[in-house]
């Protein structure tokens, strides 16, 4: 069930919306749009700007999918922290986990 959505937001509105959604227990967070993806961990990658789907599930797992293919570009089994902040005029989700220590970042363009 779709509980809330935002269309074509500016960076400030997207940051506020996503952080509000992340505070709601048991919510699925799905963001589709143009973004850059960075992950310096086990399978390091830096994806150029493109259309991606970012999913943060109620079990705190994170997946980032490209427009093609069935496997995610990045998958984190459980993130402890996933704040959304503004950086350089863009909304950025920075998901972190402690064990192993790694992070994934999605910058929404």
What positions do the PLM features span?
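Surface-exposed beta-loop interaction hotspot
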Residues: 93-109
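Acidic, aromatic-enriched beta-alpha/helix-loop junctions
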Residues: 42-92
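Short acidic, glycine-rich loop/turn motifs
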Residues: 35-37, 66-68, 95-100
């Amino acid at each position: 069930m779709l509980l809330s959505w935002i269309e074509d937001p500016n960076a400030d509105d997207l940051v506020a919306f996503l952080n509000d959604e992340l505070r709601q227990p048991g919510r699925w967070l799905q963001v589709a749009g143009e973004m850059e993806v960075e992950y310096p961990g086990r399978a390091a990658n830096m994806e150029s700007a493109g259309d991606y789907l970012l999913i943060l599930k109620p079990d705190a797992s994170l997946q980032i999918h490209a427009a093609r293919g069935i496997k995610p570009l990045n998958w984190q089994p459980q993130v402890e922290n996933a704040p959304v902040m503004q950086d350089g005029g863009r909304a950025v989700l920075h998901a972190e986990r402690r064990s192993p220590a790694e992070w994934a970042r999605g910058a929404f363009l």
